[in-house]
Amino acid sequence: MSEKIRILCVGAGNMGTSHARAYHKLDEFEIVGIVTRSAESREKLNEELGGGYALFDDYASALAETKPEAVSISTYPDTHASFAEAAFDAGAHVFIEKPLAETVAGAERIVAKAKATGKKLVIGYILRHHPSWIQFIELAQTLGKPLVMRMNLNQQSSGAAWETHRNLISSISPIVDCGVHYVDVMCQMTRSRPVRVSGLGARLTNDIPEDKINYGHLQVAFEDGSVGWYEAGWGPMMSEMAFFVKDVVGPKGCVSIAAKSAGAAGSSDDVDAHSKTESLLVHHGELGEDGTFVKA
């Protein structure tokens, strides 16, 4: 591999743009091309990064022409499996945004291809590397068992944000899009195996295909008796009351993410705010002999 990792950036949405900005700034990387379906998005990103990058509207052509050492895939989930496999076949390492694929079979196929080609596969689980979320998980692990984990991320979207959500819904539901993060967090908090999953969804608008939903919630039961709940909905009809709940309760107390700004009215569709924590609120449930809290 060369001194700089020659990387092909695929996708220029919220995450694709963030990754490209990082690659542009890091001395260890050299962007060899930007691939998007939309000419407007790739030209806008190229201009922001100072121009001069090779631009493509066809992924296969970009792979063949640039011969990258690594590919960063931040596209809609229905392209993840095929794009990752093509990158491995081209001899490149892969960074891919979550979810890895639309199905378990698709995910297993990508992992098998990575092993067969001897290339690295990295999946974008940002909360696993977020200092505040790491501490949130560590504090949850001190609360005893079982845990009750309550989380949601509803987004009241309109204009361009609702257009993005409608397009995304054609490929993935809200409950899966961010739910993969929060179920992963629940697994880390409990360090236990999920034994039962249930969920419900609803189609709250005629602006999306008849077989799609824009609201859902799921429940996960764990082997150790812990239970988790996650809710997500997108659209102009969504409530902004308690749309940013990140709360864990155990026998010894509870810990919550208290993000007053990120959880304020009018900010539910602000993607940049979704990973902000601001502060962690810890409550100790121990009672003294007089029946009052030992710690205020």
List each model region and its residues:
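N-terminal Rossmann-like dinucleotide-binding module
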Residues: 1-50
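Hydrophobic residues in well-ordered beta-strands that form the structural core
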Residues: 96, 121-123, 230, 257
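Contiguous beta-strand/loop segments that form the cofactor/metal-binding neighborhood of enzyme cores
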Residues: 183-266
